[in-house]
Amino acid sequence: MNAHQIIIRPLITEKNTNLMRFNKYSFEVDRNATKQQIKRAIEEIFSVRVTAVHTMNVRGKLRRRGRQYGYTPDWKKAIVTLAEGDRIDLFEGA
């Protein structure tokens, strides 16, 4: 997998915006990606130094369409801690 296949999209929410004060950024990542692969992908794409990666699997939510019930897909979330002084400019306008 290359770096752009591992990192699916950044997550910009109120909670994640508060984490940015502590140099932590959140991303939706490929479900099969490991912490080492996520670290290398972030360092390659954004040219920053990653000190820690925390991952979690998020279960899909129950959704209804008329009388039919289904679930949204499960996905994986990664919270990446950057080295002191490094920033990701993509999040700064949020």
Swiss-Prot record:
Q: Gene3D superfamilies given for it?
A: 3.30.70.330
Q: Which gene encodes it?
A: rplW
Under HAMAP family, the record lists: Ribosomal_uL23_B
User: InterPro entries recorded for this chain?
Assistant: Nucleotide-bd_a/b_plait_sf (IPR012677), Ribosomal_uL23-like (IPR013025), Ribosomal_uL23/eL15/eS24_sf (IPR012678), Ribosomal_uL23_CS (IPR001014)
Protein name per the record: Large ribosomal subunit protein uL23
The processes (GO biological process) annotated in the record are: translation
What family is it from? Belongs to the universal ribosomal protein uL23 family.
Lineage, highest ranks first: Bacteria, Bacillati, Chloroflexota, Chloroflexia, Chloroflexales
One of the record's GO cellular component terms:
ribosome
Pfam families, A to Z: Ribosomal_L23 (PF00276)
Subunit organization:
Part of the 50S ribosomal subunit. Contacts protein L29, and trigger factor when it is bound to the ribosome.
Describe the task this protein carries out. Answer: One of the early assembly proteins it binds 23S rRNA. One of the proteins that surrounds the polypeptide exit tunnel on the outside of the ribosome. Forms the main docking site for trigger factor binding to the ribosome.
